[in-house]
Amino acid sequence: MSNNSRHYSAIDEAILQGQAMLETLFGKPVAQRENPAKGLSQPALTSAEKKQSIGFMRVNHSGEVCAQALYHGQMATAKNPAVRALFTTAAKEETDHLAWCQERLEELGGHTSYLNAFWYTNSFLIGLLAGLSGDPLSLGFVEETEKQVEIHLADHLRKIPSSDLKSRKIVEYMQQDEIQHGLNARSSGAKELPYLVKKLMAFHAKVMTTLAYWI
């Protein structure tokens, strides 16, 4: 039985969330959809271009680690089963992104961020707080998060080497999914967040993207 169709005790929920964290941080994510870059040939990148692609794909991978944590935190505190189901579906699609980014990093010879455990823990707590604020604000948090992520991905598409078609194709697909997640949240009753909260979210994202690019 799926975990969005029954009630779990606090202990059950803690075990499920702990398992999700371990799978995200230490497991090998399995995508339900085919990698959009499959079939594209490996580009001939200079060392500088490869370093640049690795940096951006590492940022994107860490972003997906954060997305998993946020959604799981929100799932744990969602009041409405329909809202919880929406978070569950989005988290599954974000798992595809996680798998695609990790696969591309491995192809490029790069490593994932050494700070992913911190990103996950921090984002999970934020997700819990968002969920505890009520479903409308929690959905508003998703809408604003996805809006900011879409902007980051658009920026990456301007900076990833034009010859790195594999990385670019993955980012393009991710961008479309993020836009749809935001639209789904809005249509499900998202409430707009206060201006200060949006600015704090943008600051948090800036710290993550800056550090994850290098570490």
Curated annotation (Swiss-Prot):
CC cofactor note: Binds 2 iron ions per subunit.
SUPFAM superfamilies documented for this protein: Ferritin-like
GO cellular component, as recorded: plasma membrane
Binding-site residues, Fe cation 1: 64, 94, 97, 178
EC number: 1.14.99.60
HAMAP family documented for this protein: COQ7 (MF_01658)
Record-given protein name: 3-demethoxyubiquinol 3-hydroxylase
Species per Swiss-Prot/TrEMBL record: Coxiella burnetii (strain Dugway 5J108-111)
Lineage of source species: Bacteria, Pseudomonadati, Pseudomonadota, Gammaproteobacteria, Legionellales
Encoding gene (name): coq7
